[in-house]
Amino acid sequence: MTFAYKIDGNEVIFTLWAPYQKSVKLKVLEKGLYEMERDEKGYFTITLNNVKVRDRYKYVLDDASEIPDPASRYQPEGVHGPSQIIQESKEFNNETFLKKEDLIIYEIHVGTFTPEGTFEGVIRKLDYLKDLGITAIEIMPIAQFPGKRDWGYDGVYLYAVQNSYGGPEGFRKLVDEAHKKGLGVILDVVYNHVGPEGNYMVKLGPYFSQKYKTPWGLTFNFDDAESDEVRKFILENVEYWIKEYNVDGFRLDAVHAIIDTSPKHILEEIADVVHKYNRIVIAESDLNDPRVVNPKEKCGYNIDAQWVDDFHHSIHAYLTGERQGYYTDFGNLDDIVKSYKDVFVYDGKYSNFRRKTHGEPVGELDGCNFVVYIQNHDQVGNRGKGERIIKLVDRESYKIAAALYLLSPYIPMIFMGEEYGEENPFYFFSDFSDSKLIQGVREGRKKENGQDTDPQDESTFNASKLSWKIDEEIFSFYKILIKMRKELSIACDRRVNVVNGENWLIIKGREYFSLYVFSKSSIEVKYSGTLLLSSNNSFPQHIEEGKYEFDKGFALYKL
């Protein structure tokens, strides 16, 4: 690894890339101040033999300001405090048991998942998650962010594990314990921007683009002068999480905000690093562009899978009747049918919301190139009141929505608590210390999202914690859906037959067919089968070809 430090026997070699600085000193707390040597690329280095694990340090710049290491491995006192040397991992296993076709993902925000809001809290729930049937947990970003309360997308130290969650040792233990249970760990990482508080990289060098902007903060310089070192900073970060913590995969935040005009896009390079270690990488993208997941021979970035917001939007708009914002493009049953058949609803057609033609067809890509959900942190948390879908629809609709995505050919992702009918909201929350930034966040969330709760108030964070009031019927329904998904080999195979009427769908796979009845309907059934699961008791145990009157609900039949 190029950045931060390397422990070599009794010596520690420190490295800082700071081409904007003429001189830099290393200040090791309670040890001394040391002049670093600068090379022609702006790398400052020094080797010391009097420092050890747990020692803390800062860098002193030309203007005498003291800053943490931008590649810090741990910030025990937060984003403005000194960096700490940690014990490097002594063992690395380049084997992973996680296969894309087996993925059933469970998205977790560490701080609100359990009362304690730590990695230890997550560990105590691993048996529960294993029993549910999921195969991987996806951890929302844990790179050090300001304070103790944040979604994680305001992180500023890409290599440092959040102190309030349990730090490096806590995360290492979580990954180890998850692996013992046969669960993979996917880490959500943010390479499109850095947070607005605690970012000292602007003083050091051209880490950030002068050409491009994001709504959330400065974006990395991937394609301008001296971008080679910035790309190295990011690519080594990917490798660091794999080799130091043995994570099984990554979720890349909002890749549509990563702009790179280089001959080889940074996303393709990230995928190369991930695949070198037999890991998985998933992208969040709102471009509806198959290039994200297309293989290199088709000029793609070769990312393993990408999120599909269209799938969520089509189900949400149809079941809730909401038509505001991006939901204005959705609301018909035909949208659900199209997303089932073609992945993207907008795959080259005009979007009224965007006021332009949007997307491209996915072609022959299989279902495991796409991740679907009926809830996630964005779709819940960016609502003004943070409502989960269970507060917006009736119980039968909730079960129908669950079946639609858990039995789809795509990779399903459950948002924490959804599987048992969690009703607590999930708000946006933060813990900044800068008064101007705090005011800006409050005003921005109220204006853009209609959020009346104060993001900075700890009560907003506490209200977002899971209640763990488990609805056993819903939990059992989810558990059986997941079991059926595995037993019927549903994953990846997009060769399903979808037939719909005015208020119903029939979806037929190789070994099954499923009925989705959105309101009482007369339906001509052209298959026969034995009932495996239903949302209520109105469906027959055995069904033959013929015409039936069905109440609202869902049923799954074995052919």
Swiss-Prot record:
InterPro entries: Glyco_hydro_13_cat_dom, Glyco_hydro_b, Glycoside_hydrolase_SF, Ig-like_fold, Ig_E-set, Maltooligo_trehalose_arc_C, Trehalose_TreZ, Trehalose_TreZ_E-set_sf. GO terms for molecular function: 4-alpha-D-(1->4)-alpha-D-glucanotrehalose trehalohydrolase activity. The keyword Cell division does not apply. The active site is at residues 253, 284. Pathway: Glycan biosynthesis; trehalose biosynthesis. Substrate binds at residues 251-256, 309-313, 377-382. It comes from the Archaea. The record marks 378 as: Transition state stabilizer. It is found in: Cytoplasm. SUPFAM superfamilies: (Trans)glycosidases, E set domains, Glycosyl hydrolase domain. Its main location: cytoplasm. One of its GO terms (biological process) is trehalose biosynthetic process. Its EC number is 3.2.1.141. Keywords: Carbohydrate metabolism, Cytoplasm, Glycosidase, Hydrolase. The keyword Phosphoprotein does not apply. GO terms for cellular component: cytoplasm. It catalyses: hydrolysis of (1->4)-alpha-D-glucosidic linkage in 4-alpha-D-[(1->4)-alpha-D-glucanosyl]n trehalose to yield trehalose and (1->4)-alpha-D-glucan. NCBIfam families: trehalose_TreZ. Belongs to the glycosyl hydrolase 13 family. Homodimer. This is Malto-oligosyltrehalose trehalohydrolase. It comes from Saccharolobus solfataricus (Sulfolobus solfataricus). The gene is treZ.
